[in-house]
Amino acid sequence: QTTEILLCLSPVEVASLKEGINFFRNKSTGKDYILYKNKSRLRACKNMCKHQGGLFIKDIEDLAGRSVRCTKHNWKLDVSTMKYINPPESFCQDELVVEMDENNRLLLLELNPPNPWDLQPRSPEELAFGEVQITYLTHACMDLKLGDKRMVFDPWLIGPAFARGWWLLHEPPSDWLERLCQADLIYISHLHSDHLSYPTLKKLAGRRPDIPIYVGNTERPVFWNLNQSGVQLTNINVMPFGIWQQVDKNLRFMILMDGVHPEMDTCIIVEYKGHKILNTVDCTRPNGGRLPMKVALMMSDFAGGASGFPMTFSGGKFTEEWKAQFIKTERKKLLNYKARLVKNLQPRIYCPFAGYFVESHPSDKYIKETNTKNDPNELNNLIKKNSDVITWTPRPGATLDLGRMLKDPTDSKGIIEPPEGTKIYKDSWDFEPYLEILNAAVGDEIFLHSSWIKEYFTWAGFKDYNLVVRMIETDEDFNPFPGGYDYLVDFLDLSFPKERPQREHPYEEIHSRVDVIRHVVKNGLLWDELYIGFQTRLQRDPDIYHHLFWNHFQIKLPLTPPNWKSFLMCCEQNGPGILQFSTERTNEPNRNKFSVENKA
């Protein structure tokens, strides 16, 4: 590995270091750093939030002078420990090495391992016209022709993603299934259903169950739910990170992990005859921020809006005006971040993708109107204003000829648009088959027994955390579902009290559409179906993001679903008692009393 000097302070600057937090900028690189002094001990880090790369400033609420606050999402870092304190118990900041040289200068050093893509380097060869072609299908799905091989990224081409919350914005080319069947290999970046689409893969498996599919070796396996999905795929290959995988003499690829969500997110470098294609997909900080520069083509997400925050929140600061301003500000920050990233990496060509979804179900009209997305053309114009990078806003069926574009970006045949009259945007979606699957869970025998609540949350395995959550089943419009469950879970001791405990505790209310929450519970699915799919409405007091709780239910649930067959057998043996929770509100603020009725 190599050692890089990031910042050098003169003896005078060292002598003037104050106790506590010191901010510095390297004027030659424009990079920012934080140095914390506690008597003779010094700790240092980059001034960059690990969440989404925001800049830290002094936290005026911290009278002890140990923490800094991110200007993006108000995350807080205790620089004395290098641990994030908001959200609590989440990430640790990467530290820099602090050294004094022989001239009493202070150096901030970073130890860098060699870039894996630089191993066995290959010089770019000239590409023939038509030799490398990239065709956009929809959302994050690209069809790559690489010599005599074909590779497809993240095929989501039919059905919804995240239960019923996301639907395709673009109409895929009519030959999409043929294209998938002709692929030599498929790369699926991560387990989210806008990338790992079981409805799409079911169609493909009916024709080519043995098609080679490649995924990264993430902590949460990409295909963790394959057996339960009923999709018959027989050639899934789990690859180590940072190692070239040779496809033929001209083609190889390398999968890399995300620096913020290494347990699930990946990105990929594809290289053909020395020309690199970088696809960072949804990674928040792909490969920890270390990426190849001057690749032939780079593609990444751009749109924003892939979260229930803040649209699904209410109470306190979450007024419609606050939400609108927050969303507007966040989208602008994301645009600027992506533009900076592209400027720094200097690809020859950049393509924004993986953001073309819409909340098209009529019941999600509010989300659709509120959750505005970034315009890819606005991002591309921003990039072109600050760099010489060529940009491509893709339309379904459009094909980029890499050889032509690298040789002459003005070549009219460099990008072939779909024929005149081709349908670009979807105007209808086949809702019913997918909603029927969700609705089937509502009347399942499991939910005749109120003891499913204890069974489910015991299976989930999250406890020893001071948080009380009220779960409320609702109809389409988030009104209480007639006869639905409304109950408390105290995660400190994993109990299910009739009313909130007397001790001090954070509190959340989660209103969930009954069809989705019961489908998730029955099948042991991750809560991204609820949260990212906009199937909940939330309130919290205090207004704190509980990272450990959400991270557990979004990524760390058991790999096998609850054993409901055994549960029902136990219910039969214990008698026919069928219990239902009902709620009576008291005059006491934020305190709910629960009664239990035996309905047998």
From Swiss-Prot:
GO terms for molecular function: 2 iron, 2 sulfur cluster binding; CMP-N-acetylneuraminate monooxygenase activity; metal ion binding. It is found in: Cytoplasm. Its EC number is 1.14.18.2. Keywords: 2Fe-2S, Cytoplasm, Electron transport, Iron, Iron-sulfur, Metal-binding, Oxidoreductase, Transport. Residues 9-107 form the Rieske domain. CDD domains: Rieske_CMP_Neu5Ac_hydrolase_N. The keyword Cell membrane does not apply. This is Cytidine monophosphate-N-acetylneuraminic acid hydroxylase. It comes from Gorilla gorilla gorilla (Western lowland gorilla). The gene is CMAH.
